[in-house]
A protein has these predicted regions:
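Non-catalytic signal-transmission and effector/linker regions of two-component phosphorelay proteins
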Residues: 1-30, 43, 134-152
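Two-component/phosphorelay signaling modules centered on CheY-like receiver
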Residues: 36-54
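Short hydrophobic/Thr-rich beta-strand motif most characteristic of the beta2 strand and flanking loop
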Residues: 50-58, 62-65
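Active-site beta3 strand of CheY-like receiver
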Residues: 69-75
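Receiver (REC) domain active-site loop signature in two-component systems and cognate sites
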Residues: 80
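Hydrophobic/aromatic residues positioned on beta-strands within the core alpha/beta folds
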Residues: 104-106
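A Lys-centered signature of the CheY-like receiver
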Residues: 129
Length: 152
């Protein structure tokens, strides 16, 4: 069943994956942005809304932490030094320990081509910066009540 987010391809948030009704066993979210202040600000927002959240600025640490901590969602910046969000999404999708996670691109790159690339590598949603926090919260809140999750 596809959730109705009231969004279209020109919106600041686009969701591609259908979400099946079920419940999430926890509300863990991993935020990854090489700009530490942005990651910390988003972490504070999510914690204030009742999520358990960790923020990373090192893209090279993402796959290991995601596999160990098992967040239900990973919010990734696209443009980062060393390893970009597109490659991180590919790696997270390729690993059975992380392939089930909700992947949200959070980026200033917002062209139709940018969104198509994000979708092609496995992102479930694309949020354009500057991010409308309420939109991201709507996606995560909907996912916590509408997405089946079982830790491997």
């Amino acid at each position: 069943m596809t959730a109705d987010y009231g969004m279209n391809d020109n919106d600041d948030v686009v969701v591609w994956r259908s979400i099946a009704h079920a419940s999430v066993s926890h509300r863990r979210v991993l935020v990854v942005d090489d700009y530490r202040e942005a990651a910390d600000a988003l972490q504070l927002l999510l914690i204030a809304d009742g999520f358990e959240c960790r923020a990373l600025e090192d893209p090279l640490a993402v796959c290991k932490l995601a596999a160990e901590w098992q967040p239900f969602a990973v919010v990734l910046d696209i443009k980062m030094p060393g390893l970009d969000g597109l490659e991180l999404a590919r790696r997270l999708r390729a690993d059975p320990a992380t392939s089930h996670m909700l992947l949200v691109a959070c980026t200033a790159f917002s062209s139709a081509d940018d969104r198509a690339r994000a979708k092609a590598v496995g992102f479930d949603a694309h949020c354009t910066k500057p991010l409308t926090p309420q939109r991201l919260l709507r996606i995560l809140e909907a996912a916590t009540t509408c997405r089946a999750y079982e830790a491997p």
